[in-house]
Amino acid sequence: MNNPIKLLISGADMGGLIASCALRHDFHESSRQEDRFQIYRIEKDTLTMEDVDACDLSGIRYAVNATLHDNEASFTFDEKCKEQGITVIHAVNLGKAAFLAVEKPKGYPFSEVVKKGTDDFLCSLGKYISQYGMFWQMPVPWIDEAIRHYSNESFPQLGIGAYIAAGYCANILANLAEGKEVKYFPKFYLSPLLEEI
């Protein structure tokens, strides 16, 4: 492939898994899958405003935010990308599950998940998932249980959730690169390890 798609991934551990999956995804028409994306990395789970200011977005087509979303800089990174017309994919490890949201440059802001209050990001996200499920009459009982269980402590960051997120993210990137349809935020992808059918 002559012109690889430039991809920026922020996030250390999960960011590395996403980069690996994106480079080795089955792209059917590409004999050399490594040529599909040219990947740039910010290998930090917690961004600073200095990281965001120093971030060069020249030619970047897609960005993945796999940080912990634990401060304002993470959302400032999203806004900087969106101002440059870059689609942002949010990958979140929920322990034994993964949450992914694709944010259009001029779409509904992902930062709306975090409402003003005392909840940390993952609890706010859990409440968003729960309310979304209730609204569409598709309850997510395991997320309600997790919110109750982890209301006073952090969600566990298990390897299982990171691998699920990385695989889903690679599929979303492939679909975007091939011009296929994806769900845009406020819709999202949610994949628990075990789901009742």
Go through each PLM region and give its residues.
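Glycine-rich phosphate-binding loop and adjoining beta1-alpha1-beta2 segment
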Residues: 28-40
